[in-house]
Amino acid sequence: MVKHLLPQVRQYFKANLHTHTTISDGRLTPEEVKAEYMARGYQIVAFTDHEVCVPHPELAEENFLPLTGCELSFNSWEEEKFLRKAYHLCCIAKTPENRWQVYDPAYKGGNAYLYADSIVCDGYETRGYSLEQVNDVIARTNAHGFLVAYNHPTWSLQEYEDYAGLQGLWAMEVYNNHCHRIGYDDNNSHIYQTMLKLGNRFFPLATDDFHRLQEHNFIAGGWIMVGAEKLDYPSVIAALETGDFYASTGPVIHSLDLEGTVLKLRCSGVRSVKVFTQSRHATELMHYDGTLLEEAEFDLAPWLDCWKENGKENEAFIRLMLIDEHGNNAYTRAYWYDELV
């Protein structure tokens, strides 16, 4: 029996799910953002301007899908700015016309305050740096028909105690290109791993967090490849909800299948393939002569048997990271024990 861990569809669509325009603090208009991303082979962009949810149906066409969204902040205002912690959440609407959000006018979001009259909310509410409040907002945003992602914890100066208690997340950024390009080590695979081990069944994102064009490659540095049946809003949201995508800063995954207990990968040429789990079980495949890998196989039977024998079925998962010759990575989501047997 073959399980397709990544769906076999006609086409995978390239997406950036964290984008800012002149509606908030970006330098390009929504129309200019669309043009720049289409020129780089993207079909999907989530417009997630700070503090205001603005749909862009005027940008939709056969080969381009705009997703409605916004980015919300929760700041530790009492700290000096250079020490200020923050929670940032990207909220992506499951339907294109949905613009509900929580709103606190203290968060200006660049030009977003100019759109205050168009905001759909349940009234003004004060937001501060509180895990309890963040979880409440996540729960209400989920209930109003959004997917909620946790953004750039390294840029946000966050530690284990800040993120360990987060609940209800759909995804998190394992890579944020903007933060990386301005000097932060926002490769957050280790935080994703920690949150998986805490029981969060959620997905990894690589995003641009796009604000502007600049000489240091501030665009097309991180993306996801979405295995949707077609390029329309319901199909793409369905694929996002079920984790039918992978994140990348370079490598391409052509297929990821499980034949019995043997994991089979086909991909673009990479230097290394790593398999991580919740436990000491881990492995890496690479050619030490420098030859690139385009396929890999791993027999999971010993691990699966061990986890079952020790009653760890509810905790166990695998996930893959691919590293190419330039140091760029691709990340699969975690596949849990009950998906592997």
Predicted segment positions?
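C-terminal functional module detector
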Residues: 1-8, 12, 199-203, 208-341
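Structured loop/turn residues at beta-strand edges in well-structured enzyme cores
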Residues: 40, 167, 313-315
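Histidine/acidic-residue-rich catalytic or RNA/ligand-binding cores of hydrolases
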Residues: 25-28, 159-168, 184-185, 212-230
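Glycine-rich loops and low-complexity Gly/Arg-rich segments
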Residues: 39-42, 70-72, 92-93, 98, ...
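A metal-dependent hydrolase metal-coordination microenvironment
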Residues: 2-147, 151, 158-160, 165, ...
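Metallocarboxypeptidase
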Residues: 169-215, 221
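Alpha-helix boundary recognition
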Residues: 38, 142, 196-197, 241
